[in-house]
């Protein structure tokens, strides 16, 4: 089993600085949600991370089985919805996540 760690702290309003090892990235909310729109939002980052995992695994699989790929693109789309109210809060969850894969 491997343990991964990340640290997240507020930079300004809804802009967050995310750190893991020697790497840093920003996450933010769009202007209409009160952010500064200087980076993708956390939901987009989660979809991107899932897509990156799938893409990396596809390249590993192709290499292991001698499949000559020119390129492969994963387009991720997720539908967000609220659960039942818990302690006056509506937690959001993915109701569905879809992946469109284009292979070249």
Annotate each PLM feature:
Residues 50-54:
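Alpha-helical metal-binding/catalytic segments enriched in His/Glu/Asp
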Residues 1-48, 59-104:
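Extended beta-strand/beta-hairpin segments
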